[in-house]
Amino acid sequence: MENEVTKWNKIIYSIMNLPGIKVDRVAFLVEALRPHCTEPEIKKASLQRPIDVIPLKLINQLANECINEHTKKATIFSTVTGVPGGIAVFFAIPADLLQYFCQTLIIAQKLAYLYGYPDLCDQNGHLTESSYDVLTIFLGVMLGSSTANEAFKQ
């Protein structure tokens, strides 16, 4: 089991180190909250847990907007890569899977930050050990795993 966990963490590490995949917690929260909140609320939410400062209804709305935005991106990419058909499918399928997991990891980070998780990266920009677990659980929930869903609720 430990070997599988190590391999999975290497996959997450590799994807998270691609350009544009890591979400800067503070920058994301400031950008997401700016149209809806005052500057003091934004500052407090970005330094603390947004869920403690912002109404849950707004957090849920922002979460749905993030999900919809990245679902559209994944769908567009998937459609474009599938158009050529034929031999190109051998290249399109791995590219499609990679971009799907990239979008899913971006959504996972954004949702984690909206609902009050601390920064998943340390001061050097590297994922913390517990971040791998958080991202794995979020991915499991997104993929429909009942076990991950139970772990998430705890």
How should each PLM-predicted stretch be described?
Residues 1-80, 105-154:
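Terminal, membrane-proximal amphipathic helices
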Residues 77-99:
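Conserved phosphate/anionic-ligand binding catalytic regions in large, soluble enzymes, centered on
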Residues 91-113:
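Hydrophobic alpha-helical membrane-embedded segments
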